[in-house]
Amino acid sequence: MIALARDVQEFPDAYQAERARRPGVSEKGIGHALRRMNISYKKTLRHPKADEDKRHTFQETIKAYKAQNRVIVYSDESGFAHDMPRTHGYAPIGKRCHGVFNWHARGRVNVIGALISKCLLTVGLFKSNIDADTFFGWTIQDLLPKLPPASVVVMDNATFHKRQDIQNAITQAGHTLEYLPAYSPHLNPIEHKWAQAKAIRKQQNQTVEQLFKIESFYVT
């Protein structure tokens, strides 16, 4: 058991056959032993360019802001396709399930949002692609008027987020701007809100405009 635990630690993503080959035992035997040791098969992929030190520094920085009772506001963009094709359905065994797909329902609505805790502070909907000008306009007209005083605004390090007039608008309004470390979307909780919104839209068969009228999404 000790040798197997060491093997798992050294080769966490080895295939069962590879793990069995080293000590010369069967794959089935390795499988039983792993279950007895409460070791399960899973994997978390990490971007090869991600910097764990920078991620740690960012998390400590956010923790320090929270200790000062600063409001953390996470911002991000996402896209919502107009069509929501139902790729699977029910039919008697042995028979096909046929559906209808609107091949002309193309395009998407792009959204920019800001999140406080687990609730949206504001959302902007755009039929065009989001670029620096669009983001600047949303920041000035929508985000800044709604931010609590001395907020900490967090966004990813997309090039257009770093345009000087966007940075100036936020900091000159008395807020602090922080950028996520590269390749670290999991550190932005608004990503989970977008996933939740897309799941609800599919369940309730709503348009994007209807979806973002749901009051429970927002800060009250």
Regions picked out by a protein language model, each given a short descriptive name:
Residues M1-T220:
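Short functional hotspots at interaction and active-site rims
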